Amino acid sequence: MPAYRSRTSTHGRNMAGARGLWRATGMKNEDFGKPIIAVVNSFTQFVPGHVHLKDLGQLVAREIEKAGGVAKEFHTIAVDDGIAMGHDGMLYSLPSREVIADSVEYMVNAHCADAMVCISNCDKITPGMLMASLRLNIPSVFVSGGPMESGKVTLNGKVKSVDLIDAMVAAADDSVSDADVEAIERSACPTCGSCSGMFTANSMNCLTEALGLALPGNGSVLATHADRKGLFVEAGHLIVDMARRYYEQNDERVLPRSVASFKAFENAMTLDISMGGSTNTVLHLLAAAYEGEVPFTMADIDRLSRRVPVLCKVAPSVADVHLEDVHRAGGIMGILGELDRAGLIDASLPTVHSNSLREALERWDIKRTKSESVRTFYTAAPGGVRTEIAFSQDKRFEELDADRAKGCIRDAEHAFSKDGGLAVLYGNIARDGCIVKTAGVDDSILTFSGPARVFESQDAAVDAILGNRIKPGDVVLIRYEGPRGGPGMQEMLYPTSYLKSKGLGKQCALITDGRFSGGSSGLSIGHVSPEAAEGGAIGLVEEGDLIAFDIPNRKVHLDVSDAELERRRAAMEAKGDKAWKPAAPRTRRITMALKAYAAHTTSAALGAVRVVKD
């Protein structure tokens, strides 16, 4: 029987000093025998996905106390990728994932917490907390802040759904008036919550449902809707029960590593492929698997991508479908239900809320549930009122979208595509693989070839695109932007958005050892491994070299002979200290924090996790 971790600091004569400090936080004699639950919050006024979390930690804390636990809240940092995008601030985004994971470990281990509720939402916060949960392996429940309502704007007399990607594309399109750009800007992000499409934040919050670590609805019910409050209330009660089951009944089934097993990671990746999730999820699932000592690799992702169809298409893959529409169609449990019927997931696995995923689907899949309350839950609709306040509206759709032939969520027979929404490509330019979001690629360019336009930084590529120096048929290649070369593996949302704004979204490709925002679409190939800074072949590409992409056959090929590549490699190595570094100087300032990250990070093919030798 494992002892409560917290008793290290709450029991015994020698802990009188520690108990004195606990008493100063409000604890009383009767509290020293209760489980201490960390409420890991991430409120900040910098991020719309987190502005409404300030009071939600205390909401969970009160429910923990009602259930017989002691709640102690702390906050992690949270970077807004959209605000950090397009300048050196993006160098800090991916490294912040490790900082978040470490900070959770530091706080939870330093204070001997028994379990935790993780209140996350945006891009690197959910992955960072997930990594910490699997690293610590103490009872954990995830509850996110929820998705933002989609924006609505009237242009030329027509109402259109918009998000921040539309604002970025419009701003760089000379044919769009200043007035229309401002109208889109003002409408794109109308409420608190994570941006409304299937971008990285929402993708990860959906995947926590598939991993079994979050309650049904976590990925899809809107931040503004009153129904979301129930998730926070339930999380507070559930975590106390889980702590007691583990520490008092020796029930290891509630531990993160028991729930998020190899098969659970397969389920999560299957979901991701089926809904065309962000390519960043590949990085984050690989990193979480590493922390949990789960042998889940790029090879598994490649294998799954070849058999899983696209059952759901959401912005940015399609313009007018957002998370509120996915929720109306049954949310993530609806997609998992279809994957289960197609025999593509293992529904026997446990979750934090049910004995098995199959048991959960019987209640939460709208195609099989007999519960009217569940059906009502999935009618939660946007309120259409600008607000930063959680749970502030209770609008409902008149009916569910249960059409699995033509609706938002399809069954396998009526899939949007028999080929999955993410793919791993291999070739001489990416020996260890690279990633493309196939759900966002137009069918006309699933095979594509063109001359390389080589850039040593994202900034240089942006200048060329906006300067009209990129032509139809070009392959924009951006290198030295990987985990080590950036450092920090910047997102390339601006280059992909600007290609769209120039009318080149279906006429050009972009390949990089950096990564893409969940908002990126088009023929955008990222995570090229090995990266240029590690001696990858992407560092040997020269202007005009032909690069060919064959997504159906999972291939990418640099049309340069092996002998020529070896000659170029030898010439590069002869540069000594200047080898495998940008040829042109870059103005970015690399601080000590970024240097420390670069010194220990690994390849994107490994999730860009940090490895420190013993």
From Swiss-Prot:
A GO CC annotation given for this chain: cytosol
A molecular function (GO) term: dihydroxy-acid dehydratase activity
Pathway it works in: Amino-acid biosynthesis; L-isoleucine biosynthesis; L-isoleucine from 2-oxobutanoate: step 3/4; Amino-acid biosynthesis; L-valine biosynthesis; L-valine from pyruvate: step 3/4
Keywords associated with the record: 2Fe-2S, Amino-acid biosynthesis, Branched-chain amino acid biosynthesis, Iron, Iron-sulfur, Lyase, Magnesium, Metal-binding
InterPro entries with a match to the protein in the record: Dihydro-acid_dehy_C, DihydroxyA_deHydtase, DiOHA_6PGluconate_deHydtase_CS, ILV_EDD_C, ILV_EDD_N, IlvD/EDD_N
Catalytic activity from the UniProt record: (2R)-2,3-dihydroxy-3-methylbutanoate = 3-methyl-2-oxobutanoate + H2O; (2R,3R)-2,3-dihydroxy-3-methylpentanoate = (S)-3-methyl-2-oxopentanoate + H2O
Cofactor annotation remark: Binds 1 [2Fe-2S] cluster per subunit. This cluster acts as a Lewis acid cofactor.
Enzyme nomenclature, EC number: 4.2.1.9
Purpose: Functions in the biosynthesis of branched-chain amino acids. Catalyzes the dehydration of (2R,3R)-2,3-dihydroxy-3-methylpentanoate (2,3-dihydroxy-3-methylvalerate) into 2-oxo-3-methylpentanoate (2-oxo-3-methylvalerate) and of (2R)-2,3-dihydroxy-3-methylbutanoate (2,3-dihydroxyisovalerate) into 2-oxo-3-methylbutanoate (2-oxoisovalerate), the penultimate precursor to L-isoleucine and L-valine, respectively.
Family: Belongs to the IlvD/Edd family.
Quaternary structure, from the entry: Homodimer.
PANTHER family the UniProt entry points to: D-XYLONATE DEHYDRATASE, D-XYLONATE DEHYDRATASE YAGF-RELATED
Protein name (database record): Dihydroxy-acid dehydratase
